[in-house]
Amino acid sequence: MNRIDLPPPAAGGVVLSWPGKAPPTFPPPKAPRLVETFEPQRLVTLQSAPPANRLYYGDNLDALVHLLDAGYAGRFRLIYADPPYDSGVEWTRKARLRTTLPRELNGVVIEQPQYSDVWSPGAYLQFIYTRLPLLRELLAEDGSLWLHCDHRRVHHLRCLLDEVFGAENYLNTITWRSQTARGAKVNAFFFPHSAHAILVYARNRAAPTRWRPQRRRIELSENEAAGLFMRDERGFFRTSDPGTYSFERLKQLHAQGRLYAPYGGEVIVDEAQRRVYASKGGNLGVKYYLTSLGDGRYQVERGVDNIWDDIPGLGTTPGEDLGYPTQKTEALLERILNAGSDAGDWVLDPFCGSGTTPAVAQKLGRRWVACDASYGAVQTTVRRLQAVCQQCSVSASDSRGDAEGRLCASPEGFAVYAFDEMRPPQESVGKIDLAITRIEGQEATIEVAVLDADIPFARSLAAVHPALDWRAAVDSIAIDPAYDGLVFRAAMADAPLHKRATVSGRYYVRAPAAPTTLAVRIVDIAGGESMTTVRIEA
């Protein structure tokens, strides 16, 4: 597959041109190699086939071509694409020690390069233009594409989408308030840029496109509610026209105290005429009461339009901050996935960055594919997904799972693939001291204790903060209880998401009967990876 035919331009339509514009062409399919998996079910049984959810490390052009070649055409109900914005910035991830030290003593240890958003004239538009036809082919007939961008290129990207998807398949533009201007930005020249745009297109609007209206909950004080709603002895309420309600249904609503008569009138039920009406004229209304939250607070539900100012950006959601630039909040992706997909649907994110889309898809029961060309992004996504998978696998009565040494059933995990020409950075040179103990009476259970990790960042840490141990320099620990020497198949991971939380260092995992090779991999805060293996004979 070298080319994909685009729809013919509409009569009188607008076609965007730029220096070096060329028809989209694609490389031949390449076979990615399986790099690692996270399979919590391996705590119970070994699986031969890797999980269906997959993360690709490499150029997403190769990944998209591979997906089409592998039979994924028309499979994805929803595609969320958050490409570079042509911002002119070399983006980095800021890494800090995992410690409760005061912030002034715990500055940024390293800035890890993530991706370049600097483009030559015409290169940015050609980059996007080449990938859009592939996304269209992967999208289900009733699916939707959500392309996230900002003020710099939104006008150009809409023209490209019209050209590739057809202007008739344009659905809407979502305006998301991504930040609240503070400090000097408040007085920015011709107003601050506080919003992003999300362009929404259908594969075939006539299909029709999968769509589920969204609602949002709004909290009001008693004074706010009094200014917006009517009130009776039961509380604040709004009214709605009863429409075609039957006589019996109106009688039922009246018995429940849910009919409203205007002008101070009363509700009259005329059995002989089989009608319900207001004594002083006017139209009856059906009462819908606000939910009382106590303490003088009330909650009301309202429909969501295309102005999303109720979902905060990362700046006001610090608990989600992974230190990754351009990270999006989970609430944003929850709304998008809930609006355009159902549980069990396939979701694709070709620019996954910090992994918000696959993390939310995992929580919502969607199947997913994600891609990124930055190894730092892949590491961040893997760590995030490991934590999500283990959280999903633990019952409410055992909510902390393996970090406390408890075994639990798990959902499907995920697999990581890489294209041959894009290999991870060389593993950092380090020594991991382990203590392995089989639990008496539970021969299949192994206690793994990480006693020390002599990794480069831990050595640097000891020189600056002697009181801190190696855990402050570690982002995650993963364990493969049956390592085959080829693919690291983690059965459990300790991947704390809170920026100051540290790994436990003591774990219980199930392992197959001896002999087996147990592998432990540590990823430090700078992205360095160290692994050690232990052969268990009995």
Task: State what each model feature region is.
Residues 56-74:
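Conserved RecA-like ASCE ATPase "motif II neighborhood" in helicase/translocase motors
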Residues 71-72, 132, 138-140, 165, ...:
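A generic alpha-to-beta junction signature in SAM-dependent methyltransferases
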Residues 74-93, 161, 347-361, 370-371, ...:
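Conserved proline-anchored active-site loop of SAM-dependent methyltransferases
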Residues 134, 139-145, 343-344, 364:
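Short glycine-dipeptide loop
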Residues 1-37, 41-48, 52, 69-73, ...:
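Accessory, often C-terminal, charged low-complexity segments
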Residues 59, 371-373:
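Conserved acidic E/D residue at the C-terminus of a beta-strand in Rossmann-like folds
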Residues 84-127, 142:
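Mobile active-site "lid"/loop adjacent to the S-adenosyl-L-methionine
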Residues 54-55, 314-346, 352:
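Glycine-rich adenosyl-nucleotide cofactor-binding module
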